[in-house]
Amino acid sequence: MALPTARPLLGSCGTPALGSLLFLLFSLGWVQPSRTLAGETGQEAAPLDGVLANPPNISSLSPRQLLGFPCAEVSGLSTERVRELAVALAQKNVKLSTEQLRCLAHRLSEPPEDLDALPLDLLLFLNPDAFSGPQACTRFFSRITKANVDLLPRGAPERQRLLPAALACWGVRGSLLSEADVRALGGLACDLPGRFVAESAEVLLPRLVSCPGPLDQDQQEAARAALQGGGPPYGPPSTWSVSTMDALRGLLPVLGQPIIRSIPQGIVAAWRQRSSRDPSWRQPERTILRPRFRREVEKTACPSGKKAREIDESLIFYKKWELEACVDAALLATQMDRVNAIPFTYEQLDVLKHKLDELYPQGYPESVIQHLGYLFLKMSPEDIRKWNVTSLETLKALLEVNKGHEMSPQAPRRPLPQVATLIDRFVKGRGQLDKDTLDTLTAFYPGYLCSLSPEELSSVPPSSIWAVRPQDLDTCDPRQLDVLYPKARLAFQNMNGSEYFVKIQSFLGGAPTEDLKALSQQNVSMDLATFMKLRTDAVLPLTVAEVQKLLGPHVEGLKAEERHRPVRDWILRQRQDDLDTLGLGLQGGIPNGYLVLDLSMQEALSGTPCLLGPGPVLTVLALLLASTLA
């Protein structure tokens, strides 16, 4: 009774409060919009009382006018006018409700000659007996194949009479079908009884995969037996691959425990990981935990005999509300290690996560976390911040699950937010980064060290530095290298010469001036890429001779970098005479006869351009004219 009231209110200039109330009712699902009032095109129906009976040409009516015709008005039209209306509806692609289609079909007392001119879905409501003879029925069911059969429920009388008529028309005898027969049946193939599934599994199972509604009990048993038998097209479950599991998605609820146990567990795990990245499986995930769903589920009792005694393969046959009602959260928590071996759908995993969330509102214990497996992919950073993760084995297990999901698409060099949060919780729980932890983290995410703050890096022991590779430091900034360099220097202190330089080279972005001076005496031949990453304040005090010794044959590269820091700033602090000794044509040094007084080294690094470098300096003429006069 709510719909007749809702329609004029929504279509009129009602009060904002009333409109908001109706919008709320629609959004909560307590009031459903009538399909007789608006089609799938989103058009609003116009009042049509008497419109159909008066115009000389129904095709002149707009789609908006045609959309909302009442059945009572159609019943007063002649057969010819009804046919004219049906043709106009098809031409203007007007989407009709089931009742409107049934009403039109009832008024078409004689079978139409031009089926192509009628709305496709209207044919579902016509009596197939009216199209007798091979040519007539073939033409009729060829059109039915393209219609939306699921507009009719499986139990509807119109749908029940279509399948036997179609089988007779296509000359099907017995239960053996060809691939051409299945194609000819279209959506009606989803209604074929179990005996057809048993005898024609090779051609029928691939069609049943895409059937929108659940199979009936007879069909399920036949499909299960066919799959367990290992015949074509899928073969024995023990030989299934990830692509086989993909192809069987629509039939997963049909699989029994013997079938599931026969599938290689590595294949199940790989398929689960691959499917989690498929957007088509992610779309409905969050809908099942909306408040309205939760309220409805909580009020539903577990059906007799379905209370779960253990977490096993039988649960994949449970509907979402049955999982919520029949699986005890405490049982789930103690048997989490079994979940990954069972091919739950991602909607079912949502229900399991919801149950754990209710059992542990303050965060999961580590005994549960370490067995989350693929359920970890459903966790948000907010969920993970409640955890206390201290076991390296737990961290390894969850990082293994995330292989293939490690990097964020928005920032490819950064891990996904939930992974970054997990690592953060682990590091805080452990208190320091030992070698085993660092090995694990850098193997998973090479840039991990550079994602830590200087304060967090201070917990890295020098002994762990041996596990750091050059690429692990690519994105570190000077503040981070300032912390890591002293640790690296301590770790490699017993090495000499070129071996020491090879190990320390990646950390030199944090080296002070005195260490660079020491390296210049060892003929290390530092490359320009490393030199350009040195701290500017550490490079500025170096003399031309020290830089020449530090770079060795690579000193010629200074010319190409003379406009970039730190080379630019270093040039501005050198005497031009000294720069000229390099023979590189470097310009911008201090002219002869000038004395430079640097008032503030800190200000000199502030970036303000001046004669002798970035920062305020006082330049005075060394041989002042006054002294000459004197």
Curated annotation (Swiss-Prot):
GO biological process: cell adhesion; cell-matrix adhesion
Stretches for region Required for megakaryocyte-potentiating factor activity: 262-286
Modified residues (Phosphoserine): S200
Tissue expression per record: Expressed in lung. Expressed at low levels in heart, placenta and kidney. Expressed in mesothelial cells. Highly expressed in mesotheliomas, ovarian cancers, and some squamous cell carcinomas (at protein level).
Superkingdom: Eukaryota
Native source species: Homo sapiens (Human)
Glycosylated residues in this chain: N57, N388, N496, N523
Keywords: Cell adhesion, Cell membrane, Cleavage on pair of basic residues, Disulfide bond, Glycoprotein, Golgi apparatus, GPI-anchor, Lipoprotein, Membrane, Phosphoprotein, Secreted, Signal
Membrane topology listed for this record: Lipid-anchor; GPI-anchor
Lipidation (GPI-anchor amidated serine): S606
Name of protein: Mesothelin
